Amino acid sequence: MGLTTAAALPFGGVVLIVIAFQLALALGAPWGSYAMGGAFPGRFPARMRVAAVVQAGLLGLVAAIVLASANVVFQMLDPELRWLIWLPVVVSAAAVVLNLITPSAGERRIWVPVSLVLLASSLLVALTA
């Protein structure tokens, strides 16, 4: 297994966990204090449940870009689309910053390490793919 694949697989696995978390929020799990800055402790209201589903979908798209860039799935990124790998890097970097500044201590404890793993692995794929 090459370095690019070795970086992409943890990204995909971690994103699956985050997607599961988002879908659990959408289904009513009482974990609102660990998302969205802790603004909705307990169960998300209806509009935030919809937002959680949208976030899960976007995370799936970001994971597909990383995995395709590493030729783990699809193997569809022709040279003209190679720049797409920088989108997950930017999204992951933004997640690190937002999770560092969140007012929710629980959210910081959980999601800063997760977003750092996503940033490191997506950056490694971007630099080696």
Q: For each predicted feature, which ranges?
A:
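Interfacial loop at the N-terminal end of multi-pass membrane proteins
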Residues: 2-8, 28-52, 73
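Non-cytosolic membrane-interface motifs at loop->transmembrane helix junctions
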Residues: 4-8, 38-39, 75-83, 106-115
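Hydrophobic alpha-helical transmembrane segments of polytopic
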Residues: 7, 11-18, 48-58, 84-91, ...
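Membrane-helix boundary connector in multi-pass membrane proteins
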Residues: 94-110, 126-129
